[in-house]
Amino acid sequence: IDVEVVFEGGSDEFGEKRNRSRWWDCSLADAVMNYDALPVIDYNWMHQDHEFTDGCEYLIITPDGSDFVDKANEIAEFRNKQGILSQVVTLSDVGGNSTYAIENYVNDAYNNWAIPPAAVLLLGDFGYSITNSVIAPIYDNYCASDNIYADVDGDHLPEMIFARITANDADQLDVMVSKFI
């Protein structure tokens, strides 16, 4: 069977270059027919002459407590050494510990940063305190799920990876983070 796809309008591109991620390419190669038809992207542009104000591949959102901020910076340093552009923001930077503030911050990052996050890490257990927890949206009035934050365009599918390290204090943070650093 031969199938011909014709594009009309648009920019003759397969999506925006800034929304492509080297971390997703392996999955795309396995899941997309004719993956080789996609233009090859040189991801080195992300590492050249960019400051963190231009975005990051790995965004860490942390409560304002100093134990959490210190551990978030340790994780970011580890990821940066791995070649993953990482940035830490606190809940105060985001606009508060509310689903509205977090979702708006993440949506803005994805839609407007030169380098949109491919992954977001929420550091802290579910809760309302700005010093040691991060709130999660309640899906359909019964289920807390961070996946709602990852759905930027409203199609109920994630545009980025969301993860959470649950911890309530410095001791729990040390245990969790020591598992991968």
Language-model segments: which ranges?
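Short beta->alpha junction loops
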Residues: 89-98
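Structured catalytic cores of large enzymes
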Residues: 1-57, 62-65, 77-80, 98-181
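Short, charged/polar "capping" segments at the starts of alpha-helices
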Residues: 66-71
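Short helix-loop-beta junction
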Residues: 74-87
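Short hydrophobic alpha-helical runs that function as membrane-insertion/retention elements
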Residues: 86-90, 119-121
